[in-house]
């Protein structure tokens, strides 16, 4: 079960930082989908990593599971954004997490997309998977500012810069 005050170890933070760096490496290359990073760990050893594919598919969770040559049963997944729980261009990430018997999922922030928001927690907990959230919340929220703006306002997030020369 997850609470608002989940406790995280230094190793948890290190694994989530790696997931965030994976997400940052694909920033701007995932089409309309957010860039997500995923790290799968067992006994504090990294079994696999994944990130959102170019143009948004496959999702990071799917790629991390696909990239592994190990049995993932009993492992722990760190993912920057709440895993999806709906059918779209891809099946729900919650399905592949359950199928691979991952015992714990830690995600950085809740997805504000109405199709996902808060649903993952209930689905995974109903399968006795421990779920924790809000690890590195401040840093990850900052990274997803453009994505959240787009989902809230249905507009692109635009950054403009103006420069002027001193010798005019």
Regions found by a protein language model. Give the residues of each.
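Residues that line or immediately flank small-molecule/substrate-binding pockets and catalytic motifs
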Residues: 54, 81, 109
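N-terminal beta-alpha supersecondary unit
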Residues: 38, 42, 46-67, 136
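Anionic group-transfer/hydrolysis microenvironments
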Residues: 37-39, 50, 82, 163, ...
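Acidic, glycine-enriched active-site microenvironments
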Residues: 15, 31-39, 73-75
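Zinc-dependent deaminase
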Residues: 1-30, 43-46, 57, 87-167
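Short HxH-centered metal-ligating active-site micro-motif
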Residues: 62-98
């Amino acid at each position: 079960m997850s609470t608002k005050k989940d406790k995280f170890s230094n190793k948890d933070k290190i694994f989530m930082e790696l997931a965030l760096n994976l997400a940052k490496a694909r920033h701007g290359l995932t089409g309309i989908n957010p860039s997500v990073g995923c790290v799968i760990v067992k006994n504090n050893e990294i079994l696999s990593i994944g990130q959102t594919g170019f143009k948004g598919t496959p999702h990071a969770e799917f790629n991390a599971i696909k990239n592994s040559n190990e049995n993932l049963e009993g492992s722990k997944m760190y993912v920057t954004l709440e895993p999806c729980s709906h059918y779209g261009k891809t099946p729900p990430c919650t399905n592949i997490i359950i199928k691979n018997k991952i015992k714990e999922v830690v995600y950085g922030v809740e997805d504000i997309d109405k199709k996902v928001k808060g649903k993952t927690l209930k689905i995974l907990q109903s399968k006795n998977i421990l779920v924790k959230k809000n690890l590195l919340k401040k840093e990850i929220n900052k990274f997803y500012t453009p994505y959240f703006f787009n989902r809230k306002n249905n507009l692109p997030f635009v950054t403009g810069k103006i420069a002027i020369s001193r010798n005019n």
